A protein has these predicted regions:
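Membrane-interface junctions at transmembrane-helix termini in multi-pass inner-membrane proteins
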Residues: 143-167, 359-390, 430-432
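Hydrophobic transmembrane helix module of multi-pass membrane transport proteins
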Residues: 53-57, 101-250
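Transmembrane helical elements of multi-pass membrane transporters/channels
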Residues: 14-31, 46, 171, 194-206, ...
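Membrane-proximal transmembrane or re-entrant/amphipathic helices at the cytosolic face
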Residues: 2-3, 457-494
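Alpha-helical transmembrane segments of multi-pass membrane transport and lipid-handling proteins
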Residues: 97-126, 176-180, 184, 286, ...
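N-terminal membrane topogenesis motif
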Residues: 1-30, 90-97, 131-132, 210, ...
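Interhelical loop/hinge segments that connect adjacent transmembrane helices in multipass membrane
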Residues: 1-12, 204-249, 289-312, 433-447
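Helix-loop junctions and terminal segments of transmembrane helices
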Residues: 64-83, 157, 215, 271, ...
Length: 494
């Protein structure tokens, strides 16, 4: 009965709202921060910020030993054992000790790698000037970014979701209070200090809460380090996956910088932020609620009952994703001519059509993302990596081809095409390996919302947003999508 309740539409809606609202608060604060950042840095400064942020993401993903993800599973196993046997509660502290020890080692490793690769990163990223010192100065930021990842894993594994929500809210507010005056006074020279302050505050806030759960400590003895090898083996697949995704982001930005300039990178990054962050609130529930529920379904790949239960879990999450995201994406596509000047300024209107096209990708992501969790939930790391490799290569090829064909607008089209192909590929792959079948209900929801988005795209490319017909027809289409989703959700949760 408990499993059925956890997989119910009402449960999914409840926790999507909970985690989405937490992220929504961060986004609202982020809107103000991005507005002032764009004002004080401009498109070129935003491009520079994007390149340094991508570098931090790539190096921290490559050097963190996969602890932010594998650490959750590693500690959670001990937590579950402790629930069954009081004598095993000490294992939780031991698991946390290992996570913190390897997080510290990974942090030093990441900082050293950053220093050593500084000249290489400069040559690969910039075709002008010498930014080697800037890349080297990112080392402390990477150090605290990796440390923060370890503390986040501890909070997730021990069920401290309220603390995580509080930490995220405080971090967003503090970053706003710090970054705006720094960018105002120092301009582009303030980018590196702000990135460091962000990483340090994230670690400090996480540590503030995690040390209440388990007292801080590390152990560098050989016996302790050897005991942590399972943690490293588990994290290997996550390291490669994170590295591929971060590397994809870095390669695309470096390509745009080489083929265009920092302004192009800044416009691209701003558009991607709107699409993937603001439209992605619905996805915030996936790691926190959906993945644990899916992982809790036992049985082999071919076990008929297990296959049915997994299909039910995935399809209900997918259906709710599509119903919630359809109206949001339609409204974003229609409202971007107003959203961009509010979030940034008039200089960023060059990303309008790119962002409108890329937004369609979010509907495809709503479909394939729950399905892509199947290999992870089964512990099939090799299949997960094969799937991720295909998707990353596909995205790089489509974005580069799109830019060559139609500039920045082509990049947006390339993203939408890549996500559409990825959806089809994931459906075929998951059916062959896991026996997954998309529900008829989910298929109908997808087709309806996709047609709505195509209607909105036709409107925004054929009618000027300065024309009143643009807004009249657009609002009617968005209301159609909203009404459809509202009626279907109300029916499902009854």
């Amino acid at each position: 009965m408990g499993d059925k309740k956890e997989n119910s539409y009402s449960h999914i809606l409840k926790y999507t709202g909970l985690f989405g609202s937490v992220q929504g608060l961060g986004i609202l604060v982020g809107v103000l921060r991005n507005k002032f950042t764009a004002l004080f840095l401009g498109p070129s400064g935003m491009g520079l910020l994007s390149l340094f942020s991508s570098t931090i993401s790539v190096l921290s993903s490559a050097c963190n030993f996969g602890i932010p993800t594998s650490g959750v599973k590693f500690i959670s196993e001990k937590e579950h054992a402790a629930d069954e046997s009081q004598s095993e509660k000490a294992d939780i502290a031991g698991a946390v000790l290992l996570v913190r020890t390897y997080s510290l080692l990974a942090a030093f490793f990441g900082a050293i790698v950053c220093v050593l690769l500084g000249p290489l990163l400069n040559g690969f990223t910039f075709s002008w000037g010498n930014h080697t010192l800037h890349f080297i100065l990112l080392a402390p930021t990477i150090f605290f970014t990796i440390l923060a990842g370890g503390e986040t894993a501890i909070l997730k594994a021990t069920g401290q979701l309220r603390a995580l929500a509080m930490q995220a809210s405080l971090l967003a507010i503090l970053l706003l209070l710090v970054s705006v005056p720094v960018y105002w006074i120092f301009g582009e020279r303030g980018i590196l200090p702000v990135l460091f302050i962000l990483a340090f505050m994230q670690w400090a806030l996480n540590f503030r809460y995690s040390r209440r759960v388990v007292r801080w400590g590390v152990n560098m003895r050989k016996m302790t380090l050897v005991a942590g090898f399972p943690l490293l083996r588990l994290g290997g697949a996550f390291v490669l996956s994170g590295l591929m995704n971060s590397g994809c982001e870095f390669l695309i930005r470096a390509f745009l910088n080489q083929q265009g300039d920092l302004e192009v990178v800044g416009l691209f990054n701003a558009g991607i932020t709107i699409v993937f962050v603001y439209a992605g609130m619905v996805f915030s529930v996936m790691d926190q609620d959906f993945y644990p529920r899916l992982s809790g379904i036992s049985g082999s790949r071919k076990n008929e009952e297990s296959v049915k239960e997994r299909n039910l879990c995935v399809n209900r999450q997918l259906e709710m994703n599509v119903l919630l995201l359809g109206p949001i994406v339609a409204a974003i596509i229609l409202g971007l001519p107003l959203i961009i000047p509010i979030l940034y300024n008039a200089q960023f209107m060059g990303m309008l059509q790119m962002t409108q096209l890329a937004a369609v990708a979010m509907l495809f992501k709503a479909v394939y993302l729950p399905i892509e969790y199947l290999p992870l939930s089964r512990g099939d790391s090799r299949l997960f990596l094969i799937q991720e490799s295909f998707c990353v290569i596909l995205l790089i090829v489509c974005e580069i081809a799109g830019y060559q064909l139609d500039g920045l607008r082509g990049v947006g089209g390339g993203i939408a095409v890549a996500y559409a192909i990825e959806t089809i590929a994931v459906l075929i792959f998951s059916r062959a390996v896991y026996g997954y079948r998309l529900s008829a209900l989910g298929f109908r929801f997808c087709i309806f919302q996709l047609l709505i988005l195509l209607l909105v795209l036709f409107l925004v490319f054929m009618v000027s947003y300065r024309d009143w017909l643009y807004w009249l027809i657009g609002v009617i289409i968005v209301l159609m999508s909203t009404s459809f989703s509202f009626r279907k959700i109300r029916k499902l949760v009854r």
